[in-house]
């Protein structure tokens, strides 16, 4: 993301009333992009229900800087791996990770994404870190919303 170079702020007082501040749109957009996470959800299994619950109004994670999901990896910087990853899905996940712009982070959501879970057989991958580097692990089956928010705040 770009650095915030210059901010031009002017206080305008229409008719002598209370003032309000205006700023350049580009500067405000650069600041928002610098301090917001744009996520790409890779949802494959039952943890997807808890992911939807965390992104709902009760545990609104947009208040912590994680904005609406982007469904293009080129526009996102946080990859949420939610659920079990099979051997057939592994190349797709790797390609999505490679398409993401720098800087990029990966969050493994749940036990299956972290270490394979109880699906320990030849068709599943025993953890996201066997395919791509993983930065944050949120344990649980499914993880509690509070644990997800704690992982997001790291």
Region annotations inferred by a language model:
Residues 1-72, 100-104, 122-124, 130-137, ...:
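Iron-sulfur (Fe-S) cluster-binding modules
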Residues 2, 63, 81, 85-90, ...:
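Metallocofactor- and cofactor-centric catalytic cores in central/energy metabolism, strongly enriched
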Residues 48-50, 84-88, 113-115, 143-145:
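Gly/Ser/Thr-rich loops at beta-strand to alpha-helix junctions
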Residues 74-76, 82:
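Internal helical hairpin/lid segments
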Residues 77-78, 105:
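Structural motif
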Residues 111-115, 127-130:
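A mid-sequence interfacial segment
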């Amino acid at each position: 993301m770009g650095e915030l170079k210059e901010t031009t702020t002017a206080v305008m007082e229409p008719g002598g009333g209370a003032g309000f501040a205006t700023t350049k749109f580009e500067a405000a957009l650069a600041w928002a992009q610098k301090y917001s996470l744009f996520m790409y959800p890779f949802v494959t299994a039952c943890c997807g229900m808890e992911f939807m619950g965390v992104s709902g109004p009760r545990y609104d994670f947009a208040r912590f800087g994680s904005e609406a999901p982007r469904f293009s990896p080129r526009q996102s910087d946080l990859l949420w791996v939610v659920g079990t990853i099979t051997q057939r899905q592994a190349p797709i996940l790797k390609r999505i990770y490679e398409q993401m712009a720098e800087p990029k982070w990966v969050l493994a959501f749940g036990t299956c994404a972290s270490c394979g879970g109880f699906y320990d057989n030849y068709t599943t991958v025993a953890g996201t870190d066997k395919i791509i580097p993983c930065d944050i692990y949120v344990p649980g089956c499914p993880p509690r919303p509070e644990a997800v928010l704690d992982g997001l705040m790291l």
